[in-house]
C-alpha cells in the first residue's frame, strides 16, 4: 500500500456515502472525479468506484462474493482481507485519531466514510467531495449493536442494502467526532472536505450545493 502514497497529489475526489440521497446524484457526476465507494456501493446500477473500502467484518463476510466481483482497487480491514482476492489490507484497529499512514494503522471512527477519508489523504487528494452522507438513520435499540434487518432498508440508497442481513446500528455522535478529526487534519494541511449532500445530518464540513460541481 505504500506505493499509493501521494499518487493523486493535488487532485479532487468524491467519497460516496450510501444514504438515500445518493439516488438523486447524477451518475455523470460520479464519473467526473476519482471515487471512493464503500460497503454495498455495487448495488448502485451502472457504477463502480475507483477505490473500494470496507472495514466492517459483517459486511465483508456476508457480501464477499459481490465484493470480489468488483474490478477496482480494494482496501479491506486486515482481519477479513483473506476473503477478498487482490485486496490491500488495512490495520483498522488504530487509536482514536486521524491516521496519516493507513498501511500502518487506521482508525475506523465508527463509520467507513472516515476510513475512506484517511486513505484519500494518504493518496494525496487535496479536495474531497462528499455525496450520500445523509448521517440520518432510523433504528431501534442502542448504537453500535448487531441486529438483523427483516424488512426493506430505508436508511440507504437501496431497499436491499441490509435487507435480510445483519448490520451494526450507527453511532452518529462518535462518527461526528471522527469527522471533526478529518476536518482538522485536512484544514491543517490546506486541504478541504466539502459536503455536497443535501440535508445532511452532519454539520462538521463546509457545505456547498452539488449543482455548482456538475
Question: Where do the model's predicted regions map?
Answer:
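Metal-ion/cofactor- or nucleotide/acyl-coenzyme-handling active-site neighborhoods
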Residues: 1-214
Amino acid at each position: 500500500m505504500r506505493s499509493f502514497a501521494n499518487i493523486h497529489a493535488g487532485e479532487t475526489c468524491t467519497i460516496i456515502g450510501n444514504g438515500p440521497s445518493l439516488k438523486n446524484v447524477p451518475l455523470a457526476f460520479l464519473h467526473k472525479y476519482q471515487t471512493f465507494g464503500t460497503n454495498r456501493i455495487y448495488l448502485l446500477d451502472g457504477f463502480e468506484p475507483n477505490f473500494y473500502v470496507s472495514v466492517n467484518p459483517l459486511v465483508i463476510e456476508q457480501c464477499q462474493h459481490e465484493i470480489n466481483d468488483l474490478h477496482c482497487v480494494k482496501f479491506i480491514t486486515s482481519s477479513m482481507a483473506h476473503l477478498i482476492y487482490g485486496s490491500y489490507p488495512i490495520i483498522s484497529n488504530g487509536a482514536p485519531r486521524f491516521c496519516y499512514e493507513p498501511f500502518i494503522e487506521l482508525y475506523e471512527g465508527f463509520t467507513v466514510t472516515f476510513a475512506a477519508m484517511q486513505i484519500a489523504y494518504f493518496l494525496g487528494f487535496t479536495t474531497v467531495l462528499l455525496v450520500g452522507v445523509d448521517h440520518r438513520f432510523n433504528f431501534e435499540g442502542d448504537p453500535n449493536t448487531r441486529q438483523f434487518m427483516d424488512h426493506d432498508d430505508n436508511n440507504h440508497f437501496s431497499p436491499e442494502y441490509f435487507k435480510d442481513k445483519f448490520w451494526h446500528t450507527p453511532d452518529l455522535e462518535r462518527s461526528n467526532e471522527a469527522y471533526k478529526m478529518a476536518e482538522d487534519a485536512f484544514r491543517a494541511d490546506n486541504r478541504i472536505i466539502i459536503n455536497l449532500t443535501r440535508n445532511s445530518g452532519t454539520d462538521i464540513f463546509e457545505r456547498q450545493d452539488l449543482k455548482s460541481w456538475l
